[in-house]
Amino acid sequence: MGAPHEKMAFQAEVKQLLHLMIHSLYSNKEIFLRELVSNASDAVDKLRFEGIADPSLLEGGGELGIRIGFDAQARTVTIADNGIGMSRDEAIRNLGTIARSGTREFFSQLSGDQQKDAALIGQFGVGFYSAFIVADRVTVESRRAGVPAAEGVRWESAGDGEFTVDAIERAERGTTITLHLREGEDDFLSAWRLKSIVQKYSDHISLPIAMRKESWDEEKKEMVAQDEWETINQASALWARPRADVTDEQYIAFYQHIAHEQGQPLAWTHNRVEGRSEYTQLLYLPTNAPFDLWDRERRSGLKLYVKRVFIMDDAEQLLPAYLRFVKGVIDSADLPLNVSREILQESRDVKAIREGSTKRVLGMLESMADSDDAAEKDKYATFWQHFGQVLKEGLGEDFANKDRIAKLLRFASTHNAGDEQTVSLADYIGRMKDGQDKIYYVSAENWTAAKSGPHLEVFRKKGVEVLLLTDRVDEWMLSFLHDFEEKALVSVARGGLDLGALEDEAERAEHAKVEGEFKPLVDRAKAVLADKAKDVRITHRLTDSPSCLVADEGDISGTLARLLKQAGQKAPDTKPVLELNPAHPLVRKLALLESVTGGEADRAAFEDRLHVLFDQALLAEGGSLADPADYVQRVNRLLA
């Protein structure tokens, strides 16, 4: 009979999840049936797929499907499938642990507020563990396709932190889950109730879901189950139906099925494509970002079918990585049933599907972003809040759609009082000053640092808008986004300041004159700061601050250097340029000290002031001091 009775403990996170579900999801208990039916559907899909390569797994054929039953006397509900089944090891691995990445992040988000936690758990996808919302004991009996009847397995738990595993004899391939209902859950011991839940959440599943027929027993004065089974769902692939025949409610229910989420999608597109390649696509934009959005190992949200036969779950070849948040189904009429991931990478049909699906997703985003309807614009704002940083990756990954992606970008800006990223590049160009020919931006590690940085002072004085870039991906993105509609993107904190036509001849002449007057100060400052600064120069970008640091042309910014170090990567060893404001009293005092041919005290005072101006500029841009104690000593000497 195989391995003996064995008792094991749940993974720690499972205990916590079970507790949360029992206490947080009581208001939406019926989702347990949706989740268990979805799992059963996946198991049958996997059998179909593995059966292509090994027909013996089908064990003589027979109709594939799901059966639901209940026993009012025993107070049990049963969900059975004849899918791929599980071995003993698979039962322990799949039912005793949470395999999905992002688990730690998930638990860190929980607030203790039942309403918020319920939504969060629904977003995360509770799967098999949802059974414990209504059951105080769950029994799972299973046998994997292709193994002897003697290698069946029984898994059982009361949801109390432990589970048992036994070897059993099981003639049928597949899995049967029996829920022993909690007190007060008799509502689910009703054929009408169970049917209504299936038709609400799982009507679209392309497998027949069956229950026993019922008839009225006059003697017992109640409905009695018959031996005959009846299909209670439509059992047709939703994506294969004409759009006109599918309601919004059905689209939403299908999204919840494939995404394992409780909420509604932000938008969807359903199309049949004919021509060089023939395929059907049903693609959804989620409302919320998953916890593992930034995980390099995370799975794609696309399911691939060939002629309605499930092929694979995470078909990442069908969309570029920057659209990895998209959920949905693609059903090809051209790919072979025995398609492998290697074939997918080389297939011309897959390339056509990828290009077509990318255009559809970008089209969905454009229709929301460009809409005059406030509700649609709000949808795009929601999308950008959750997925904007990922979309920016497309500028470096998808050259063919680079211009379309650039139009979809949104930024914070000095035009707005808050940190909301709502300004498009087209919005910015529409507000440019007469004579302005550049799009100005500043990058910083957060909105406060960007908004209050000294580099913005002359732009604020002249009323010129500056984009505030604070996402970690922005510096990388800018290496691919050099211009938009023939307007160059220019950092206000890089290189010499060139305001072009925003500056008149009189201003330029005055600047040249001042630079000549302060040349002795600049020359001496270069010598003193040779170890810290690449260059020292007089600037006209400052109106209130005495100094600022800028990156030289071709060098990485201080912001990017700090981000690289935080990520554990080596940043190029470059020095910033120190710029001094000739109109500021501190700089004028510094120039006066430079002109005095005094002794050691005057030299020390000059160097202290100069180093303090450099260090203050470094702090103002969000940097950290290499030697804070030295800075404090210099400030103390100046204050004494």
Curated annotation (Swiss-Prot):
Residues 563-640 are annotated as: C. Residues 1-341 are annotated as: A. This is Chaperone protein HtpG. Molecular chaperone. Has ATPase activity. Homodimer. It holds the Pfam family HATPase_c_3. It is found in: Cytoplasm. It comes from the Bacteria. PROSITE patterns: HSP90 (PS00298). The lineage of its organism: Bacteria, Pseudomonadati, Pseudomonadota, Betaproteobacteria, Burkholderiales. Belongs to the heat shock protein 90 family. GO terms for molecular function: ATP binding; ATP hydrolysis activity; ATP-dependent protein folding chaperone; unfolded protein binding. Keywords: ATP-binding, Chaperone, Cytoplasm, Nucleotide-binding, Stress response. InterPro entries: HATPase_C_sf, Heat_shock_protein_90_CS, HSP90_C, Hsp90_fam, Hsp90_N, Ribosomal_Su5_D2-typ_SF. GO terms for cellular component: cytoplasm. Residues 342-562 are annotated as: B.
